[in-house]
Design a protein with these regions (language model features):
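Active/binding-pocket-proximal capping segment
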Residues: 460-476, 517-531, 572-573, 618-622, ...
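Beta-propeller folds
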Residues: 7-8, 18-600, 605-611
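Cap/lid segment of the alpha/beta-hydrolase catalytic domain
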Residues: 471-483, 628-746, 750-753
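Active-site-proximal cap/loop segments of hydrolase catalytic domains
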Residues: 689-838
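Active-site lining segments that contact anionic ligands and/or coordinate catalytic metals
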Residues: 299, 452, 490, 499, ...
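Bacterial Sec-dependent N-terminal signal peptides
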Residues: 1-22, 778, 787, 795-797
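Generic beta-strand/beta-sheet core signal
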Residues: 257, 314, 396, 418, ...
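Short, structured interface segments
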Residues: 123, 185, 189, 614-632
Length: 838
């Protein structure tokens, strides 16, 4: 009671200080008014930027910014918006008021009875806003401007301008949940209507749309129709079920699935249909047969190569037929676990629905009219180039290694290439632990080999497999790895055009590797000496490869003080623009470039600065802030943050984050919350937007209310995770007390999951803290060791042996290791008041 009164008195005095300065103290109700920025977009010419302000509670607002006039307009309650490909129009959906929807929810009104959204269309800040009510959804060609399709409920359909007047009268309402589809040309306002639509899709680069219609009575047509030049044309009128519509990118070819069987047979005879505008109707090109994969899969969506040559689809095995003659009490329902299974039963159970829909990829060559198997039960997965134009495809299987993955956590793979010209499947690597990929030019398969801790390539043309030589070079894997398993790579930037080189990362620099094992990679940057991290930014969303001549946008980060900035790298001269400036902000690595102009959209933030949008028209030399998401922040007492360094008990220099309350007085000590997980110092300049969180505290909130927050970086010793955390947390907290920053009498711990475990362990070793909260803490590693993660079905053993728990041995190899690291067995030593959250 005495301690509680003291803490309340301290908080009251700190609150009064903030009030004396004329500033508010953050309260829980403030979480509701703080905005986040979502769905930012920039037009092709860089003139228009849109984004949504979404409050903690309430209706979102779409903001439209015009870079030419610097004017901003807004539309309330927008849940989704799009700038068309040409950048001339903005459209989206306006939802009913949130309060109205919540009232319907409280009355338990079914969602299908809720009021529909309203479609809006505008040309920009100064343009008028057209509103069309009762819209279910909209779609548009991803890379073709001026066109939009939207669906509405039947009772609100306007007259169809493509039909005779007497045909526009409303027919008897269908019992089916069907919509009417309206295609609109944005520049003219002309609209065409197709009634009773079940499904529709646009071509990506053309004003071409295909739809499935249903008949509500004898006067209407059911089938598949395409729309072009303001006309609808049916390409399949047979009464059947149609699905999985797909258009080639240029709109010149159409594929879809059809099922003419109207019975309820367990096995439905789906067929693949193809249409290329040289015929009057679509024709079946794949159907049920007597092969090992007899069925066309209804679950695999047909997909086109970018050049339209290849059509990829799925075939499937015959499913197990249910015996419908059995009574419910005659059906056996039992789980059988056996050591002979490739995967443990819970994994099988999780995968059951997926396996029932399993399909194997085939390809139809539209030029040769040949079908080629890519995948099979022996090679169940495929990897393609992004455009799928290439002659070669990589396939892989993890089946031989599924059993061992039960205790390793990850399955190794066998790899093979498929030649689409010949259909030949040629294995080229067994038992490699990797995430395989294909270079954009289709010359190499490649990936990072976890076991070898290096990159590999396989040259399709020569059949040569190579591991990258790294003798005498820095590590291309995590230098700070403190987990008893293979370290992760630092990743890649991508490939230079025509697969000339693969651009790799080490801890600080970028390297170019030709992909040939006989050649070592060449360093492109010189960041290691300065501890300056170089990372490539893909600002162009449509970019497939790195240019061999045009400058690359580079994100720079000082690994010591965490300052960041941007620069440009010249790939021709291997030189970095030295005019870069780093500042105490986190400059985002998500940068959006307008497609046809050198205009860039990005954010920068720090503890006190919200990540508002910045727009630059001079290649990021300068920028203008174009949003002001939370102007109310200036009314509140806000803390500050810095790096804190101290010497631990082993005389090793340690680092952590130290958040200080507003008006921090060096002559006073403050109540302190120690909150940590693993390492967080890289987040020095992240902005703590006030918001509730399921597992951690909000730093801005507690700083505003007078707390110091300490977040130490934890470095782990294998086999001693709890003790590692104890020594670093205790030495760091003691240092704060000795520096008279932290009040020795008012210290607290807070953490969740892995952080919760570490807190539970620390409390068995010390009574230094006044109170603690641990969420989802595993306190008994012996019982948790054989647990199951039900979302994946996998066992948890490998998590303790070789992943986050870092014990490094099995329970049977060293049972005391598990006991000593389990707080449960020392719980009698805990005297600190502890709040447990589960």
């Amino acid at each position: 009671m005495k301690h509680t009164a003291l803490l309340l008195l301290l908080l009251c005095s700190l609150t009064l200080q903030a009030q004396d300065a004329g500033l508010k103290v953050l309260d829980h109700s403030d979480f509701l008014i703080w905005n986040t920025i979502q769905d930012r977009q920039i037009a092709a010419d860089g003139r228009i930027v849109t984004y949504r302000l979404v409050p903690g509670e309430g209706n979102p607002t779409l903001k439209i910014y015009d870079a030419t006039t610097t004017a901003t307009s807004q539309i309330q309650r927008v849940s989704k918006s799009t700038i068309d490909y040409d950048g001339k129009f903005i459209f989206g959906l306006i939802t009913p008021h949130r309060d109205s929807l919540r009232a319907l929810e409280r009355k338990k009104v079914e969602k299908k009875e809720w009021p529909a959204d309203t479609l809006f269309i505008t040309s920009g800040v100064a343009g008028s806003v057209l509103r069309i009510p009762n819209v279910a959804e909209y779609k548009y060609p991803a890379k073709k401007g001026d066109w939009l399709a939207y669906s509405i409920k039947p009772q609100t359909v306007p007259a169809d301008t493509t039909k005779e007047k007497d045909a526009t009268k409303e027919k008897k309402k269908s019992k089916k949940e069907i919509v009417h589809l309206i295609v609109r040309q944005l520049s003219t306002g002309l609209e065409d209507t197709l009634r009773n639509v079940k499904e529709y899709v646009w071509a990506e680069k053309a004003a071409m749309l295909v739809a499935v219609t249903a008949s509500s009575d004898s006067t209407e047509t059911a089938g598949v129709a395409y729309w072009s030049n303001h006309e609808w044309q049916y390409i399949k009128k047979q009464k059947a079920e149609y699905a999985k519509l797909s258009l080639a990118m240029d709109g010149n070819q159409i594929a879809f699935l059809g099922n003419p069987d109207t019975t309820k047979a367990q096995v439905q005879p789906w067929e693949l249909y193809y249409f290329d505008f040289r015929t009057d109707s679509a024709t079946s090109i794949a159907a049920k047969n007597k092969s090992a994969l007899p069925l066309v899969s209804q679950h695999a969506e047909p997909r086109w190569s970018e050049d339209g040559k290849y059509l990829f689809y799925g075939r499937a095995q015959m499913p197990v037929i249910k015996d419908t003659t059995l009574l419910p009490d005659e059906i056996v329902d039992v789980e059988i676990w056996t050591t002979e299974d490739k995967e443990i039963y819970p994994v099988q159970n999780v995968k059951k629905a997926q396996e029932e829909k399993r399909s194997y990829t085939y390809v139809y060559d539209t030029q040769s009219k040949q079908h080629t198997a890519i995948c099979s039960p022996a090679w169940e997965s495929a990897v393609f180039t992004p455009d799928r134009n290439g002659r070669f495809v990589m396939v892989y299987t993890d089946q031989p290694y599924q059993k061992e993955s039960s205790w390793t956590g990850d399955a190794r793979k066998d790899l093979a290439k498929v030649d689409l010209l010949t259909g030949a499947v040629i294995p080229f690597r067994k038992g490699i632990l990797t995430n395989p990929r294909i270079s954009p030019g289709d010359k190499f398969a490649y990936g990072y080999s976890d076991i070898d801790s290096t990159w590999w390539t396989y040259q399709f043309a020569t059949g040569t497999f190579s591991l990258m030589k790294r003798d005498g070079l820095p590590s291309f894997y995590d230098e700070e790895n403190d987990v008893p398993t293979h370290p992760n790579s630092y990743g890649i930037a991508g490939w230079i055009k025509d697969d000339q080189s693969l651009i790799l990362y080490d801890r600080y620099d970028m390297w170019a590797w030709s992909g040939e094992g006989s050649k070592a990679p060449v360093t492109l940057t010189k960041g290691r000496e300065q501890k300056l991290v170089h990372r490539y930014i893909k600002a162009d969303a449509e970019e497939k490869f790195l240019s061999p001549s045009a400058p690359w946008l580079i994100h720079l980060k000082d690994d010591t003080n965490k300052s960041t900035g941007y620069s440009w790298f010249n790939p021709s001269s291997f030189s970095l623009d030295s005019a870069y400036v780093l500042s105490d902000f986190e400059h985002s690595r998500q940068v959006n470039k307008s497609r046809s102009a050198d205009t860039y959209l990005f954010t920068k933030e720090n503890f006190a600065t919200f990540p508002d949008l910045q727009l630059s028209g001079d290649r990021l030399k300068t920028s203008v802030k174009i949003s002001d998401a939370n102007p109310q922040q200036k009314q509140y007492a806000w803390g500050s943050i810095q790096l804190y360094h101290w010497m631990d008990w082993d005389s090793v220099m340690r680092t952590g984050l130290l958040v200080l309350p507003p008006g921090f007085d060096t002559l006073r000590s403050y109540p302190t919350i120690v909150n940590f997980y693993e390492k967080s110092s890289d987040e020095l300049h992240n902005h703590p937007t006030p918001a509730p969180h399921r597992s951690t505290i909000n730093y801005a909130f507690y700083a505003s209310r007078g707390y110091v927050i300490f977040n130490p970086d934890i470095s782990y010793k294998i086999g001693l995770p709890g003790e590692s955390a104890y020594q670093i947390v205790m030495s760091g907290t003691s240092s704060l007390v000795n520096d008279r920053i932290a009040d020795r009498e008012n210290l607290a711990l807070q953490g969740h999951s892995w952080g919760g475990y570490q807190i539970a362990y620390i409390l068995t070793r010390t009574n230094m803290f006044k109170c603690a909260e641990a969420g989802a803490a595993v306190v008994n590693m012996t019982s948790a060791y054989d647990g199951i993660r039900w979302e994946t079905g996998k066992g948890r053993q490998f998590q303790y042996e070789k992943e986050q728990s870092r014990l490094g041995k099995t329970l049977w190899q060293d049972p005391n290791l598990y006991i000593n690291n389990s707080p449960l067995f020392k719980i009698n030593k805990i005297e600190t008041p502890l709040l447990l959250l589960h």
